Amino acid sequence: MAVSLRSSIAKRRSHLNAPLCVFTQSCKGLGLNKREIESITQVVFPTHQDEFQHAEVLVVLGSYKATQYKMPTAVRLYKEKKVSKLLLSGGNLAIDQKPEFESMKEYALDNGVPDSDIILERHAKNTVENAQYSSEIIVESEIAKRSVAILTTAFHIKRAKYLFKNALPQYLELHSYFVNDRSTRRDNWWLTESAISRVMHSHEVIKRLGVKPYA
């Protein structure tokens, strides 16, 4: 994993005459074989949603395109009364060049979530900080006394859930819900270098943390 992604791909090309991809006619020359794809997919991606009846707060982890891929599901879960409040976490810039928390809040307000049910975490720059800062808000404000849910992308959910589980008090039951973006799904992530980079980063972190299989 120390070798850069581009160098690794170039090295694979030199000794693999025809990369074998199980899910597609062409791997676009990226050099991942069937066994590698299946192994990495199994480690990184969940196979099913974490079923839950209700959570007092849903933490939505910010990202560049959170309003496109995450917030529609967050609002739906809120309107279905699966969650009572939305905690929007992230201080990086979103696609509209606003902080993630601000961009996500605007989406929630525009789609019928009242301001009184929106909590903001304004500073997190990575998943560790998402978990740490959001957990501090949850405990200090006492917005959840029984259960918390988190929402992020499929390739991100395993490590995010692990970090939140370790950051939250043990008395809080933790649930998770994942969404898919266009290019980093369990059925297409190996087709572009950017998606491979995201998945391989998650793969490395999951292995390093010792995250157990998704259940």
Question: What do the PLM-derived regions correspond to, one by one?
Answer:
Residues R6, R12-R13:
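Basic polycationic patches enriched in arginine
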Residues G31-L191:
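A structural signal for short, hydrophobic/glycine-enriched beta-strand patches
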Residues S183-A215:
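C-terminal capping/extension of enzyme domains
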